[in-house]
Amino acid sequence: YAGLCECVRYMKGVSHTEPKEGTPFALKVMQYLNDACEQWKKESNIDFSIYGTPLESTTYKFAKCLQKRFGIIEGVTDKNYITNSYHVHVTEQINAFDKLKFESQFQKLSPGGAISYVEVPNMQDNIPAVLSVMQYIYDNIMYAELNTQSDYCQVCGYDGEIKIVEEEGSGKLI
């Protein structure tokens, strides 16, 4: 599935991370989907499950279909993608630990599988911080990935975050 964030924003006018209305509604939606799967399973003797997957190319297609059907709705269909499964929207300011804690409750309601991601800066010189995030993942969430910015130049051997400066189209590295 995809678009829980946008669903809640459309139905409640808030993000699914908003604790008073957003999160409870999002959890109810997820429980409803799980209950529907159980009902279909009983009726058909075929197993159904909710799969919280990253759907990068599909979220673009879904967004285009929603835009065509419903038009542009601010905060819902105004981008060329919808948010993966239960994920916190990329524009929301949230630290890695809070993001993992928030998303863990939705992984429990995604029995077909789920993955969360946290983006962190280049941490190759801060291994204790990496281990701290990894331990938090191990202790608090079913499945998560830690994405860090680290680049390697095959020409000069530089290992770290490479930034490109657009200086008159030079593509100069700094």
Q: Each PLM stretch: what is its role?
A:
Residues 1-174:
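Long, C-terminal-biased catalytic regions of enzyme "large/alpha" subunits
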